[in-house]
């Protein structure tokens, strides 16, 4: 009876007829079936697997090449950018130096022009002062001369009588006659 019940228990574990299933119990499977399945998998799977690996390898190599090309392009662009930066820095330094020297030159030109203007103004001032002094001196001399002349005329008119007047005229005529003889 025990055998009979064991038979029924095993029937419950077996797959039904016409269906396909895997027996995961290694000890219960047939080694020949396993070797056949593994052989078929290796034979057919090897090509598929090698194709998959080759494709993956090609994609990886292509990605590496693209990355290297991009890296090379980036390095080239970086070098160009550095060269442009150095050029711009040199130009900026030249502009800065030239700008400072031009500013200094312009500053010196303005200072020199200011000194020249000051010298001209000083000369004009001195000339104006000298001119005004000469004019003042001339005015004073004219006034002194006029006053002296008026004083002399007043004195002469007071002191001069007819006889003295005739003697003065005679003396002057004598001087003029002597001068005429010398010039002839």
Curated annotation (Swiss-Prot):
Gene Ontology CC terms: chloroplast thylakoid membrane; proton-transporting ATP synthase complex
Subcellular location: Plastid, Chloroplast thylakoid membrane
PANTHER family with a match to the protein in the record: ATP SYNTHASE SUBUNIT B, CHLOROPLASTIC
GO molecular function: proton-transporting ATP synthase activity, rotational mechanism
A Pfam family recorded for this sequence: ATP-synt_B
Protein's recorded name: ATP synthase subunit b, chloroplastic
Note: In plastids the F-type ATPase is also known as CF(1)CF(0).
Subunit structure: F-type ATPases have 2 components, F(1) - the catalytic core - and F(0) - the membrane proton channel. F(1) has five subunits: alpha(3), beta(3), gamma(1), delta(1), epsilon(1). F(0) has four main subunits: a(1), b(1), b'(1) and c(10-14). The alpha and beta chains form an alternating ring which encloses part of the gamma chain. F(1) is attached to F(0) by a central stalk formed by the gamma and epsilon chains, while a peripheral stalk is formed by the delta, b and b' chains.
Transmembrane segments: 27-49
Membrane topology category: Single-pass membrane protein
Main location as per UniProt: plastid
Protein keywords: ATP synthesis, CF(0), Chloroplast, Hydrogen ion transport, Ion transport, Membrane, Plastid, Thylakoid, Transmembrane, Transmembrane helix, Transport
Function summary: F(1)F(0) ATP synthase produces ATP from ADP in the presence of a proton or sodium gradient. F-type ATPases consist of two structural domains, F(1) containing the extramembraneous catalytic core and F(0) containing the membrane proton channel, linked together by a central stalk and a peripheral stalk. During catalysis, ATP synthesis in the catalytic domain of F(1) is coupled via a rotary mechanism of the central stalk subunits to proton translocation. Component of the F(0) channel, it forms part of the peripheral stalk, linking F(1) to F(0).
Annotated source species: Nymphaea alba (White water-lily)
Homology family: Belongs to the ATPase B chain family.
InterPro entries according to UniProt: ATP_synth_b/b'su_bac/chlpt (IPR002146)
């Amino acid at each position: 009876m025990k055998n009979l019940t064991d038979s029924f228990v095993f029937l419950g574990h077996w797959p039904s007829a016409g269906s396909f299933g895997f027996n995961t119990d290694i000890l219960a499977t047939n080694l020949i079936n396993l070797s056949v399945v593994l052989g078929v998998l290796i034979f057919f799977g090897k090509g598929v697997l090698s194709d998959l690996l080759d494709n993956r390898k090609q994609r990886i190599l292509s990605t590496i090449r693209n990355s290297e090309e991009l890296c090379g392009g980036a390095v080239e662009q970086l070098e160009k950018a550095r060269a442009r930066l150095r050029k711009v820095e040199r130009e900026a330094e030249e502009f800065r130096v030239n700008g400072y020297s031009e500013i200094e030159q312009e500053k010196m030109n303005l200072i020199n022009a200011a000194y020249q203007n000051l010298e001209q103004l000083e000369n004009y001032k001195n000339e104006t002062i000298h001119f005004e002094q000469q004019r003042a001196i001339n005015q004073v001399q004219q006034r002194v001369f006029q006053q002296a002349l008026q004083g002399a005329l007043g004195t002469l008119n007071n002191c001069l009588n007819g006889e003295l007047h005739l003697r003065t005229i005679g003396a002057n005529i004598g001087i003029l006659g002597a001068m005429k003889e010398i010039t002839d």
